[in-house]
């Protein structure tokens, strides 16, 4: 395998180009109806930990397809004129996702430093997520 960029270099690049919110600021943004939080975590993480109330769940592996209006998997929510705030468990996936969304043409993007773990530790609101039936 030819050596390429590692995840650390990719995170450094992303963090240099995107807006990063500390948790207290993110909690304030959560009160704004123009802001949509996007949860990138795996469904099992949501079921185990809960999520930010009102967040839209977009698994990280589907994000490119859900954002692109030309994709058969496009989700109209990503065409809305909203401020998108991405988050994951610890802030790495969300930094990369915010950079990706920005590269794909979404202008108002940010991510939560420290992710859901930091949000929860700071006492941010948390909603319970019901386990989906039919799965293991």
Language-model region placement:
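Rhodanese-like catalytic fold shared by cysteine-dependent sulfurtransferases
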Residues: 1-35, 43-83, 92-136
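Short, surface-exposed ligand- or partner-binding patches at beta-edge/loop junctions that are enriched
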Residues: 87
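Active-site flanking residues adjacent to catalytic metal/cofactor-binding acidic residues
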Residues: 38
């Amino acid at each position: 395998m030819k050596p390429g960029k590692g995840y650390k270099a990719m995170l450094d690049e992303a963090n240099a180009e995107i807006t990063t919110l500390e948790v207290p600021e993110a909690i304030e943004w959560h009160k704004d109806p123009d802001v949509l939080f996007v949860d990138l975590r795996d469904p099992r993480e949501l079921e185990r930990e809960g999520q930010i109330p009102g967040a839209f769940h977009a698994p990280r592996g589907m994000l490119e397809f859900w954002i692109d209006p030309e994709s058969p998997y496009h989700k109209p929510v990503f065409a809305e004129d909203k401020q998108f705030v991405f988050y994951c468990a610890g802030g790495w996936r969300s930094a990369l996702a915010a950079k990706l969304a920005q590269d794909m043409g979404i202008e108002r993007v940010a991510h939560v430093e420290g992710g859901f773990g930091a949000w929860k530790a700071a006492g941010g609101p948390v909603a319970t997520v019901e386990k989906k039936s039919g799965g293991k």
